[in-house]
C-alpha cells in the first residue's frame, strides 16, 4: 500500500477505515476493483504520473519561497493599467484571507449567499455612482476583456447590423491586443481616429489614455450621438472620484479595472473589472447582476437578476460566455470604498494627481516635453534616444518606469508613491521640484457628491469594519461551514498552505510588465506548472493566460480556428456540441466565429454515436471542432469516447475536451491519450484554487503539438491573439495550484481522484433506494458525481426540486446543482475532500426529505403548508409569537431526528422572490437624496 505524506491524508476526507466501510457498502474488496468497474480500460493510464515526489506543507512552502525569492520587487511606476496599492489589513485579514469569503460558490442559491450578494450590490452601487450610469454588473475578468465585452454590447444593441468600432484615443496596448483577438472571428472592423460613419457601432474613449492624457473628445462624441453610435468610456475609477462621471459627458457605457481599489497587482491578476451601462442596455450586458427583491415574508433580499441573458440558459445566444468572474476581488474593491468612504477615496486621488502635477511641472521647467495638458496620475515624457538609459537609472534606484519607445517614457503615480519617489524621479530628468497645480480637464471635475449611501459612511473604525465583514460572512454558507455538493463544480478543500503564498510580497506586488530578469521566480513557477499540467493531461503545450474556464474554452477554440486558417481551411466553422454540454460551450463557439450544430444524446445519457457520425459526415467539408465533456455532464464514463474522437478526426475536425470534470481523470487517464486536441483545465475546480463566491477562476489550456503555435500570445511578448490583459492571466493565484500539485505528488493526485469516485458511488448507493439515479455506466457505476431524480417527489407529493434545494438549507447544506443537466433533478459531486461523516449527513438529509415528502403525499401535511414548501426557515420566523403551521418549530429548523444543533446554519432570509426581482429590477442603492 502506498504511504502518503500527511498532506495527502489531510486533503482527502475519508480515513482508511472509512474507505473500507464505503467499499464494503458497495460490495467491493478494493479501490482498484471500483476503478476497474467505473473507468473504461481503454482509456486507463497504466503508469504513474511523472511528477516530483510529494513534499510536506513546510517543505513545499520553503521550496516555493526560494523560487519566488528570485523575484526582485521594486516600486512600480509603470502604470499601463496596473498600480501599487495599500491593501487595508482589515480587508486582507477579514476578507481576502478568510475562508468564509474565498471558499463560497457563485451565489445561485440566494438564501445562503446574502452576505456576499450584499457586498456585490455595494460594488454595483460604487460603480454606478462613479460612472453616473444606472446599471452595473458584479464584475468582469479584466479591463481588456471588459472593453471587448462592451463592444459586444454595442453590436448587439445594433442587432449586429453595424460592425465598425472606432478607438478614439490611445488605449493600453494589451487592451487593443485583446480587442483585436475578439474582433477577428466576429467580423468587427477596428478603426482608429475620429471619423464616425453610419456603420460605426461604438466609439471607445480612454479617460485618461495610456499616456495619462485627457483628450478633447467633444466633437467625436457629438458625431457618434448624431450617427447613433454608442459611446464607451474606459475610465480609471480612482480618477472618477474627482473627475466628472462619464455619463455626464455622453457615455452610454463605462468600463475599467478596479485593481487600484485595494487589490495587489499580482503580476497581472486576478482583478475585478467593472462595466456600467445606460438603462436601455440592461438586458444585453454580460456578467452577473445582483438585484434586490424580497423574501416570502417581505424582507429585503438580494439575488442574481436577469439570468436569462447568461450562457447557462441562453447557450449560443447568450450575451457572453462569461461564467465565473471576479467576485472576491469585486468584494475587496467594495470593501475598500466602504473603508475609505468618498472623502477618503478623493483624498487618495487628489494626492496622486498632485504628485503627477508637480512632476509634470518640474519636467516642463527643465525643458522636457510632456504629452498633453490635462493629466491625472501619469506623465509621458519625450526623451530623444534616452528612454532606456533613464529607465535603467530609475531601476538602479529601486523604481521601474515605463519605456514606451526609444524616445518616450511614462511615469505613473499611485497611492504608494512618496515625496522621496517624486524627488528621485525628477532628478532622472535633470529636474527639480517646483510648484504645480493639479491639471485635470477644465470643467470636467466632479462637482456633485457621490456615495452618499449610509454604508459608505458607517465603518471608519477598524472595530466597525471588522464586525461589518463578520456580519456579512455569517449570513453565508461556505466550505468553512459545510459541504457544498454542487455537481460539475468540484468544491474541494482549498488548503491553508496552498493559500498562504498569495499574500507574499514576492507574489503579490510585481507589475506584469516588470523586466524579465526581475521576475525569474514567476518564470520558474509558471514553467513548473506548465510542465506538470502537460504531464497530467498528456499535451505538448500549455497556456496559463485564460483567466476563467470560459476564457479557456474561447482560447482553445481560437487555437483550432487559427490552425485551420494556417492550413488554408479557414472555411471550417461548424462546431458539434452534445445537447448535454455546459452552456459555456455553445457560447464560446459562437464567440469564436463558429456555428453550433447540436448532437443528440441517447435516453441513457450517452452521446448518440450514430447522430454524431451522421452530422460529422454531413459537415465534413466545414467541420471545425467537436466539444465534449468527459466524463459526461451526466456523470458517466462513456465507453465510446475514443470512437467519438476518431469520427471527428476522420472528418477533418479537432476535438475540444471540456475539462470541467477533470477531477475524475487525474492520474487515471489523460485527455490527450484519449484523442483530444485541446482541453481547458479549471484550476478553480480540479486544482484547488477557491471559487471566491463567483471568481477568480483560472482556465489554462493544454494542446497537442500541432496546436502549440496557436496558443494565446501577448503584446508584451511580441506576439498576438491575447485572450486576457496579462500574459499569465491571474498569475498570483497560480501558486495555489503549484502548492497543491507539489504537496500531492503523482500518487497523491491519483488517490484524490479515486476518493472522489468512491465518494460519488457511495452516495449513489445510499440514495438509489429512495431516489432514482438517472445515469450510470458499466457495472452500474458513476464517475465523480451522480444525478438524483427528485421528480419522484413531484409526482407523489407535488414537491419540486426547488423545495428540496431550499429544505436542504434547513439541514445545513448548500443544495447540489439544481435542474442541470436534467430539469427537476439534483446533481451531486462530493469531491475527495469530504469525510464520510459529512457525506452520510447529506445522505441522511436527502432520505429524511423524502420522508417529509411522503407525509405530504399521505395528507399529514397540506401541499401548500409543509416544511418543504416553506423552506428555508429563518430564526425570526421560527421564534415568532404565532406559529400556525401544521408541523412543529423543531421539525422546521432541527429536522431529521439526529440533526446536530451545534452545526445549525440559520439563513438570514426565507425563500426569495425571483420573478418579482426581475420585474422590478433594483441593482444599486439609491443615494440619500432619493429619500428626501
From Swiss-Prot:
EC identifiers of the protein: 1.4.4.2
A molecular-function term among this protein's GO annotations: glycine binding
InterPro entries: GcvP (IPR003437), GDC-P_C (IPR049316), GDC-P_N (IPR049315), GDC_P (IPR020581), PyrdxlP-dep_Trfase (IPR015424), PyrdxlP-dep_Trfase_major (IPR015421), PyrdxlP-dep_Trfase_small (IPR015422)
Cofactor (UniProt): pyridoxal 5'-phosphate
Keyword terms of this UniProt record: Oxidoreductase, Pyridoxal phosphate
Gene3D superfamilies listed in its UniProt record: Aspartate Aminotransferase, domain 1, Type I PLP-dependent aspartate aminotransferase-like (Major domain)
GO BP annotations listed: glycine decarboxylation via glycine cleavage system
Modified-residue entries (N6-(pyridoxal phosphate)lysine), positions: 685
Record GO cellular component, one term: cytosol
Transmembrane helix in keyword set: no
Catalytic activity field: N(6)-[(R)-lipoyl]-L-lysyl-[glycine-cleavage complex H protein] + glycine + H(+) = N(6)-[(R)-S(8)-aminomethyldihydrolipoyl]-L-lysyl-[glycine-cleavage complex H protein] + CO2
Cross-referenced Pfam families: GcvP2_C (PF21478), GDC-P (PF02347)
Cited SUPFAM superfamilies: PLP-dependent transferases (SSF53383)
Domain of life: Bacteria
Function: The glycine cleavage system catalyzes the degradation of glycine. The P protein binds the alpha-amino group of glycine through its pyridoxal phosphate cofactor; CO(2) is released and the remaining methylamine moiety is then transferred to the lipoamide cofactor of the H protein.
HAMAP family assigned: GcvP
NCBIfam families linked to this entry: gcvP, PRK04366.1
Subunit organization: The glycine cleavage system is composed of four proteins: P, T, L and H.
Family membership: Belongs to the GcvP family.
Protein name: Glycine dehydrogenase (decarboxylating)
Record organism: Brucella melitensis biotype 1 (strain ATCC 23456 / CCUG 17765 / NCTC 10094 / 16M)
Phylogenetic classification of the source organism: Bacteria, Pseudomonadati, Pseudomonadota, Alphaproteobacteria, Hyphomicrobiales
Amino acid at each position: 500500500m502506498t504511504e502518503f505524506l500527511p498532506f495527502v491524508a489531510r486533503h482527502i476526507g475519508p480515513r482508511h477505515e472509512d474507505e473500507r466501510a464505503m467499499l464494503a457498502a458497495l460490495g467491493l474488496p478494493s479501490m482498484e476493483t471500483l476503478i476497474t468497474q467505473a473507468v473504461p480500460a481503454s482509456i486507463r493510464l497504466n503508469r504513474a504520473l511523472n511528477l516530483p515526489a510529494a513534499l510536506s506543507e513546510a517543505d513545499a512552502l520553503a521550496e516555493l519561497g526560494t523560487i519566488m525569492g528570485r523575484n526582485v520587487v521594486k516600486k512600480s511606476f509603470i502604470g499601463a493599467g496596473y498600480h501599487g496599492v495599500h491593501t487595508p489589513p482589515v480587508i486582507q485579514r477579514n476578507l481576502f484571507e478568510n475562508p468564509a469569503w474565498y471558499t463560497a460558490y457563485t451565489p445561485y442559491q440566494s438564501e445562503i449567499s446574502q452576505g456576499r450578494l450584499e457586498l456585490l450590490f455595494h460594488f454595483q452601487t460604487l460603480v454606478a455612482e462613479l460612472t453616473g450610469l444606472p446599471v452595473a454588473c458584479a464584475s468582469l475578468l479584466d479591463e481588456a476583456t471588459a472593453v471587448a465585452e462592451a463592444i459586444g454590447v454595442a453590436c448587439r444593441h445594433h442587432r449586429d447590423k453595424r460592425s465598425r468600432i472606432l478607438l478614439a484615443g490611445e488605449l493600453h496596448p494589451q487592451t487593443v491586443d485583446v480587442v483585436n483577438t475578439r474582433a477577428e472571428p466576429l467580423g468587427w472592423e477596428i478603426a482608429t481616429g475620429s471619423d464616425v460613419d453610419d456603420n460605426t457601432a461604438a466609439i471607445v474613449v480612454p479617460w485618461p489614455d495610456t499616456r495619462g492624457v485627457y483628450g478633447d473628445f467633444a466633437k467625436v462624441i457629438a458625431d457618434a450621438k448624431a450617427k447613433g453610435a454608442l459611446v464607451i468610456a474606459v475610465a480609471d475609477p480612482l480618477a472618477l472620484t474627482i473627475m466628472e462621471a462619464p455619463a455626464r459627458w455622453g457615455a452610454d457605457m463605462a468600463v475599467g479595472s478596479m485593481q487600484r481599489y485595494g487589490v495587489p497587482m499580482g503580476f497581472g491578476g486576478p482583478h475585478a473589472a467593472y462595466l456600467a451601462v445606460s438603462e436601455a442596455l440592461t438586458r444585453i450586458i454580460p456578467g452577473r447582476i445582483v438585484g434586490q427583491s424580497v423574501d416570502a415574508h417581505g424582507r429585503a433580499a438580494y439575488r442574481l437578476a436577469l439570468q436569462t441573458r447568461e450562457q447557462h440558459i441562453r447557450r449560443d445566444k447568450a450575451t457572453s460566455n462569461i461564467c465565473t468572474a471576479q467576485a472576491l476581488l469585486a468584494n475587496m474593491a467594495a470593501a475598500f470604498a466602504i473603508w475609505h468612504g468618498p472623502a477618503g477615496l478623493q483624498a487618495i486621488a487628489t494626492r496622486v494627481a498632485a504628485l503627477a502635477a508637480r512632476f509634470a511641472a518640474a519636467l516642463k521647467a527643465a525643458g522636457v516635453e510632456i504629452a498633453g495638458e490635462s493629466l491625472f496620475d501619469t506623465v509621458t515624457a519625450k526623451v530623444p534616444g534616452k528612454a532606456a538609459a533613464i529607465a535603467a537609472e530609475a531601476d538602479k534606484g529601486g523604481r521601474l518606469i515605463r519605456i514606451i519607445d526609444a524616445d518616450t517614457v511614462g511615469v505613473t503615480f499611485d497611492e504608494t508613491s512618496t515625496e522621496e519617489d517624486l524627488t528621485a524621479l525628477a532628478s532622472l530628468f535633470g529636474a527639480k521640484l517646483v510648484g504645480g497645480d493639479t491639471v485635470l480637464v477644465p470643467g470636467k471635475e466632479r462637482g456633485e457628491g457621490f456615495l452618499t449611501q449610509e454604508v459608505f459612511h458607517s465603518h471608519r473604525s477598524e472595530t466597525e469594519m471588522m464586525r461589518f465583514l463578520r456580519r456579512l460572512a455569517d449570513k453565508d454558507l461556505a466550505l468553512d461551514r459545510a459541504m457544498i455538493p454542487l455537481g460539475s463544480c468540484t468544491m474541494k478543500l482549498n488548503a491553508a498552505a496552498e493559500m498562504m503564498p498569495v499574500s507574499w510580497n514576492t507574489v503579490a506586488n510585481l507589475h506584469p510588465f516588470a523586466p524579465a530578469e526581475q521576475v525569474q521566480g514567476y518564470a520558474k513557477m509558471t514553467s513548473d506548472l506548465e510542465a506538470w499540467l502537460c504531464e497530467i493531461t498528456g499535451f505538448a503545450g500549455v497556456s496559463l493566460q485564460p483567466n476563467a474556464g470560459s476564457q479557456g474554452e474561447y482560447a482553445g477554440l481560437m487555437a483550432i480556428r487559427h490552425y485551420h486558417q494556417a492550413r488554408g481551411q479557414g472555411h471550417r466553422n461548424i462546431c458539434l456540441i452534445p445537447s448535454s454540454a455546459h452552456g459555456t460551450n455553445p457560447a464560446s463557439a459562437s464567440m469564436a466565429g463558429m456555428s453550433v450544430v447540436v448532437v443528440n444524446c441517447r435516453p441513457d445519457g450517452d452521446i448518440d454515436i450514430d447522430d454524431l457520425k451522421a452530422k460529422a459526415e454531413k459537415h465534413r467539408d466545414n467541420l471545425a471542432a467537436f466539444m465534449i465533456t468527459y466524463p459526461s455532464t451526466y456523470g458517466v464514463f462513456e465507453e465510446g469516447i475514443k470512437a467519438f474522437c476518431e469520427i471527428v478526426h476522420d472528418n477533418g475536425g479537432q476535438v475540444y475536451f471540456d475539462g470541467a470534470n477533470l477531477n475524475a481523470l487525474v492520474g487515471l487517464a489523460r485527455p490527450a491519450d484519449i484523442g483530444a486536441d485541446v482541453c481547458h483545465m479549471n484550476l478553480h475546480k480540479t486544482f484547488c484554487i477557491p471559487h471566491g463566491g463567483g471568481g477568480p477562476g483560472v482556465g489554462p489550456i493544454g494542446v497537442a503539438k500541432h496546436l502549440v503555435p496557436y496558443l494565446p500570445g501577448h503584446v508584451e511578448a511580441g506576439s498576438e491573439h491575447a485572450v486576457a490583459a496579462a500574459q499569465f492571466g491571474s498569475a498570483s493565484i497560480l501558486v495555489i495550484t503549484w502548492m497543491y500539485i507539489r504537496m500531492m505528488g503523482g500518487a497523491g493526485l491519483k488517490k484524490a481522484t479515486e476518493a472522489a469516485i468512491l465518494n460519488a458511488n457511495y452516495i449513489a448507493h445510499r440514495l438509489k433506494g429512495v431516489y432514482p439515479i438517472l445515469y450510470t455506466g458499466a457495472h452500474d457505476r458513476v464517475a465523480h458525481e451522480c444525478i438524483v431524480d427528485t421528480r419522484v417527489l413531484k409526482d407523489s407529493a407535488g414537491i419540486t426540486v426547488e423545495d428540496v434545494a431550499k429544505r436542504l438549507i434547513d439541514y445545513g447544506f448548500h443544495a447540489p446543482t439544481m435542474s442541470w443537466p436534467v430539469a427537476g433533478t439534483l446533481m451531486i459531486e462530493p469531491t475527495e475532500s469530504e469525510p464520510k461523516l459529512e457525506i452520510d449527513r447529506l445522505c441522511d438529509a436527502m432520505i429524511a426529505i423524502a420522508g417529509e415528502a411522503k407525509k405530504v403525499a399521505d395528507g399529514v401535511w397540506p401541499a401548500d403548508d409543509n416544511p418543504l414548501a416553506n423552506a428555508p426557515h429563518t430564526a425570526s420566523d421560527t421564534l415568532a409569537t404565532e406559529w400556525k403551521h401544521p408541523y412543529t418549530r423543531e421539525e422546521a429548523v432541527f429536522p431529521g431526528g439526529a440533526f446536530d444543533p451545534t452545526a445549525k446554519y440559520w439563513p438570514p432570509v426565507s425563500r426569495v422572490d425571483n420573478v418579482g426581482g426581475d420585474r422590478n429590477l433594483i441593482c444599486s442603492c439609491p443615494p440619500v437624496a432619493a429619500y428626501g
